[in-house]
Amino acid sequence: MTMKHFMALLLLGSAVTLQAQETVVKGKIDGISSGKLYLIAQTGEEKFDTLGCCDFKKSKFVLKAQVNEPMVAQLIVEGYQGGFRLLAEPGVSYEALLTNDSHSYIRGGKLQDDYESYMAYADSLRNVIDGVRTRYEAHKAQNKFRSASQANDTLRRSEQHLHQFTQDFLASHDDLITAYTFQTNALMKEAGLAESKRMYESLGAGAKAT
């Protein structure tokens, strides 16, 4: 219910129909020799549209889709769960390697490349934080108070660095990336209507227009 409120607000800026352009995703699907690939996007509170689809053979594919504005989409292999996030832009070509591990990537387009670079660095910071937290818990359990205190200080600094890095990244984007991040946060927090409105009003004009 709360997510519907936020999605309704987020979709207000999408009412203007723009000229669709061809967006192309070319690449390889690791471990699957043939099948059908779809590019799907949420275009309403409970509406999902297929932007494009293609058959693939020998694990290789070329998917062409009609996209009229930047949007968050998912590449989905028929018969398999999960998908691969794509910040799709009109008229942009992408290269992709779709796998079940960390080697998977989709490259091309400013939004996609910026977001993937952000996620890669943020994930590396989270790994550091997890390691420091493990050391802190170990020192604490062994009553090594000085070492635990030092680890705790490092942990707090690392968490603050990640928070500031995220804030700086979002501040540099008044576009789909910011809107997508706020939407994701609303989902995780199950924000109420008042909080959803506050989050929406904090978006810039560019993010609201996505």
Language-model-detected regions and their locations in the chain:
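Amphipathic alpha-helical coiled-coil segments
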Residues: 156-173, 191-198
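Bacterial Sec-dependent N-terminal signal peptides
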Residues: 1-27
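A non-transmembrane, solvent-exposed segment enriched in polar/low-complexity residues
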Residues: 21-164
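Serine-centered coil/turn micro-motif
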Residues: 109, 175-176, 206-210
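Short coil/turn linking the two alpha-helices of tandem helical-hairpin repeats
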Residues: 186-190
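N-proximal helix/coil linker or "cap" segments that precede and/or mark the start of modular domains
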Residues: 193-210
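Amphipathic alpha-helical repeat scaffolds of TPR domains
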Residues: 172-185
